[in-house]
Amino acid sequence: LVEKVNQFIRFNLPRGTFFEGVFALIDFKEDTVYYINCAVPAFFLYNRAYNNIMEIQGEGHVLGFVKDISPYIKVKKVKLNPGDILFACTDGVLDSKSLRGEPFGKDRLQKSIIENTMLPAQNMASTSYNALLEFLSKELDDDVSIFTLKMLRA
């Protein structure tokens, strides 16, 4: 699938068009997520048991840049426990700058995640987005995508 998406971008969209993204498959029997990170700059796992966040980036490559992406595809996996959260976002979140020229960055994003772990996944994403908008005090200069997955069952 990753190779087909890469080929489509490379050969059907305007030259110089690139995409970042995460491809994931969830094994509900094993509570495991298998994923390929294609250049998403912020991919985090919140561990409820330890109340901490760690980056689980992977070694992916931006889509549409090379003809053959297969050498760059690395499947990673992470086991999820009840209350654990996967959170990913594009560079539009991290790199957006305030009026003073300060980027929102990973620290502010992680703080927003930790402060809102009790919310449903959809509300976590919108709360992080609203924190970004409040920080910027202006319109966004870049596109923003946020993905949140929360493990609810044992």
Predicted regions and their residues:
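Conserved subregion of the PPM/PP2C metallophosphatase catalytic domain
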Residues: 1-154
